């Protein structure tokens, strides 16, 4: 009876025992434990779905355990991951992983400019992209507008205190009598957008100066904002205009 209990205890111990820790030495000669969660997030950043990223991470980890090495260089993990992605999902996915790893090692900040009309999903997309890419700094142009409204009263700058699509109502009288309603709305939007371009430029320039990634989103993000950015910077700047092309009925 005692032998049976001892055997059961031994089997339970073997089952519950934590897998060995695998140490990873990076390019700066620093040693950290291999993290499956970090590896999984890295693969998600490459555009893999949650299921595909989990599958690839699991297979890479199994290969590391089978190798039996207590410490490995980070380059070997990259090589194993590249091979695993190629076998599971094809060469394009594996190449995308290499591109992402090259970018993360470059130290270049990523600036995403998300523009689009109200209700098209800018904030939702910004939140999801920030999570996937590990970007901690996001900024809404609506919040910048609220700060400006606190600083500048309505009687001095009424166009700032309307919504972007009703800003035309605060245009000077000589302009507000134009017959073309669409042109009026566009002129009002551009007028408010130009006012918001000042704090938007400040936010972007600070991110470039501190070399941190940033997502700037809002209706005031316009293609002309690219002219405000010093192209001598080595940041990766991606302007994106979001639209709902087919409305559900």
List the model feature ranges, each with a label.
Residues 111-133:
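Glycine-rich phosphate-binding P-loop
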Residues 149-212:
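Conserved nucleotide-sensing/catalytic segment adjacent to the nucleotide-binding pocket
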Residues 208-249:
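ATP-dependent NMP and nucleoside kinases share a basic, alpha-helical "lid"
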Residues 135-151:
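Short beta-strand-centered segment that lines the nucleotide-binding/catalytic pocket of NTP-utilizing
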Residues 36-54:
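Short, surface-exposed, low-complexity cationic segments
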Residues 3-8, 49-111:
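Extreme N-terminal, non-catalytic leader segments
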Residues 109-113, 213-215:
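Residue-level preference for the first positions of well-ordered beta-strands
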């Amino acid at each position: 009876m005692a032998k049976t209990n001892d055997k059961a205890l031994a089997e339970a111990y073997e089952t519950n025992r934590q897998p060995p820790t695998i140490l990873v030495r990076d390019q700066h000669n620093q040693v950290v434990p291999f993290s499956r969660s970090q590896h999984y997030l890295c693969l998600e950043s490459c555009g893999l779905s949650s299921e595909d990223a989990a599958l690839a991470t699991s297979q890479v980890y199994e290969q590391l355990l089978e190798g039996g090495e207590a410490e490995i260089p980070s380059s070997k993990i990259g090589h194993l991951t590249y091979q695993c992605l190629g076998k599971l999902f094809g060469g394009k996915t594996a190449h995308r992983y290499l591109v992402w790893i090259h970018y993360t090692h470059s130290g270049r900040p990523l600036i995403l400019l998300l523009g689009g009309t109200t209700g098209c999903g800018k904030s939702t997309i910004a939140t999801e992209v920030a999570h996937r890419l590990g970007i901690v700094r996001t900024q809404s142009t609506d919040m910048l507008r609220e700060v400006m409204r606190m600083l500048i009263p309505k009687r001095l700058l009424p166009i700032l205190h309307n919504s972007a699509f009703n800003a035309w109502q605060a245009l000077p009288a000589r302009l507000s009598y134009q017959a073309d309603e669409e042109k009026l709305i566009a002129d009002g939007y551009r007028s408010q957008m130009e006012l918001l371009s000042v704090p938007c430029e400040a936010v972007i320039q600070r991110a470039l100066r501190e070399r941190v990634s940033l997502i700037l989103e809002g209706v005031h993000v316009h293609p002309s904002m690219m002219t405000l950015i010093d192209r001598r910077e080595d940041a990766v700047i991606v302007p994106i205009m979001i639209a709902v092309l087919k409305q559900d009925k």
